[in-house]
Structures are given as structure tokens and as C-alpha cells.
């Protein structure tokens, strides 16, 4: 729930007041199973020690600030991350800008900053975490926390079949169209939100009207292909056939399109914001010899997608 979000520094001090906190910190892009393990541990420690659980969420990745050439797309925007973290039962969420001041702090200075900012008593981090410009980690970080009279807990990296669950791994899977595996790592369906814009009406001419989606350039769109998905419009869910790519059968196909045919839906939704929850890749983008052959394939795709979503065979 967004009401748990603390927007201003002074508000954080008022809310925390005399309550010491168990704190975890990160960007939490995608809020995947690895993040959820960290959040669960934070909640557990907070309840066990009569503390408040607090998650500090960097609005942007710190490495973007350090390395201006960093350009990896995000899996989720800030609002999505806050909502997902809130669903894990965290008491308070504080969005934080990573800036020059924070960038130039040593690990000791950064811990003192967190202690003062959030009345931190216990820090929970992954075993691979490095803090400060001096990149303190492991035993050195543990010793520093002891000296500052802070508790520190390392959480082991969450793995699936010996593969570490990480945002970068999920990013690569989604780029390559391996959406089902990405969803397993996420612990949820990959979600893309965007605004419906005017298209060229080719879908309508073929008998399968589509909603053309404009998404934030910062958010990752899956690799080219046809996908089974759910479409959420004003809190109502519909089955959808999602197409991403350059539409190789059509002329003037120089622009990558994200468009979804919403099954058994015929309302005007231009200008509305919709959410796509992507379930499974059905096939690659293919160039057909004629529009008739494309039309036949779309019909097959929609039937396959309907059966998959109806039977929930992807679960």
C-alpha cells in the first residue's frame, strides 16, 4: 500500500520516532524472488526484535550515477516496486535519490547516515553487498557494524537450479523471449504498462484489431515474438495476444511495434493506460508470403492463446 511510503526526510524521522528499525536497502528492480527473500528476512528480524521494518528504495540504480554509460533497461518503475514491496508486509518504504553526497560516503559514513536517518538498529543485506566508495563487504563490513553497535545479517543469494536469481539474469531472459523462465525467477508474471496510442489500423483490416502500446523507454520490452498475456483495463482482466517486433509481412516495417489484440473486446481505449501481464511466448515473428496467410496464422495464435490462458497450462 502506497500509504506506507515516506516521501520526505523529516517525515521519516517523525514516523520512526523512538522506534528502532530493521532496514534493507536497494533498487529492487522487478522485486524478484531474490528481493523477496531479503524482504522476508527483514520482516522476520523486525518482528523477532520488536523493531519496525523499513525498506529504502533507490529511485534509480546507483551504478547509473557512477557509470554514465550504464543503460540497462528497468524491469519496473518506482511505483510498481513500492507496491510490490508493500505487499511483502514491510512497515515503511522510503524512496531515496542516489546523489553526489551519498556517492562520496565511505561505508562507515553511509552506515552512520542510515543510523541517523532511520534510527537503524539492524541492517539486512545480501552476502554480495558492498557499501560505500571503499566497497566494504563481508567480514570487514561485519566488524564495522560491530564497532558502530549495529546488528548485521547477511542473506544468501537466492538460487534456482544453481543459477543466482538476479535482475540482470531476468533482464537477459526477457530480452531473449524466455518469458516463462523469467516469470519463475520473478515469482510473478512480467508486467508492462503503457498508454494506448493510434496505430495504422492494419489489425482491424485483417479482422483482429489491436491496441498499440507506448511504454516508457526505460522499461524493458520482451524480445520480438507473439505472446499469450493478460490485459488489465480499469481493474478488469482480459485474454490477449501480444505481438512485439517489426511486423515482417507488412510494408513500412522499420519501426518496432508493441501491440495487443484483446480477445472478445471491442471498446475504444485510445489514451487509456493498460497493463500487460505476459505469460508465455507462442512463436517468433515470421514473414508470410501474403496477408491471407498472416491472417490464418493470427487466427491460430489467438485460438492457442485462448486455450492456454483458459486452461492455465502455463502454471
What are the language-model segments listed below?
Residues 199-315:
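Phosphate/ribose-recognition catalytic cores of enzymes acting on nucleotide-derived substrates
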Amino acid at each position: 500500500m502506497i500509504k506506507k511510503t515516506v516521501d520526505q526526510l523529516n517525515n521519516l524521522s517523525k514516523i520512526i520516532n523512538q522506534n528502532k528499525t530493521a532496514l534493507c536497502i536497494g533498487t529492487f528492480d522487478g522485486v524478484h524472488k531474490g528481493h523477496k527473500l531479503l524482504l522476508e528476512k527483514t520482516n522476520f528480524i523486525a518482528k523477532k526484535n520488536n523493531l519496525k521494518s523499513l525498506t529504502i528504495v533507490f529511485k534509480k540504480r546507483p551504478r547509473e550515477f557512477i557509470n554514465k554509460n550504464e543503460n540497462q533497461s528497468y524491469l519496473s518503475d518506482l511505483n510498481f516496486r513500492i507496491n510490490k514491496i508493500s505487499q511483502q508486509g514491510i512497515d515503511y518504504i522510503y524512496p531515496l535519490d542516489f546523489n553526489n553526497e551519498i556517492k562520496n560516503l565511505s561505508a562507515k559514513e553511509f552506515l552512520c547516515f542510515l543510523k541517523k536517518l532511520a534510527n537503524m538498529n539492524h541492517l539486512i543485506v545480501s552476502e554480495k553487498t558492498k557499501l560505500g566508495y571503499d566497497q566494504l563487504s563481508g567480514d570487514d563490513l561485519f566488524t564495522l557494524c560491530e564497532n558502530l553497535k549495529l546488528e548485521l545479517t547477511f542473506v544468501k543469494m537466492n538460487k534456482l537450479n544453481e543459477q543466482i536469481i538476479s535482475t540482470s539474469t531476468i533482464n537477459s531472459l526477457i530480452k531473449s523471449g524466455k518469458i516463462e523462465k523469467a516469470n519463475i525467477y520473478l515469482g510473478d508474471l512480467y508486467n508492462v504498462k503503457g498508454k494506448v496510442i493510434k496505430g495504422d489500423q492494419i489489425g482491424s483490416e485483417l479482422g483482429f484489431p489491436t491496441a498499440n502500446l507506448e511504454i516508457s523507454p526505460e522499461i524493458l520490452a520482451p524480445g520480438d515474438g507473439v505472446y499469450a498475456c493478460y490485459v488489465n483495463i480499469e481493474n478488469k482482466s482480459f485474454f490477449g495476444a501480444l505481438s512485439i517486433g517489426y511486423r515482417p509481412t507488412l510494408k513500412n516495417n522499420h519501426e518496432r511495434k508493441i501491440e495487443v489484440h484483446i480477445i472478445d473486446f471491442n471498446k475504444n481505449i485510445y489514451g487509456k493506460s493498460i497493463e500487460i501481464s505476459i505469460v508465455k511466448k507462442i512463436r517468433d515473428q515470421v514473414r508470410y508470403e501474403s496477408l491471407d496467410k498472416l491472417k490464418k496464422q493470427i487466427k491460430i495464435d489467438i485460438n492457442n492463446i485462448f486455450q492456454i490462458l483458459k486452461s492455465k497450462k502455463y502454471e
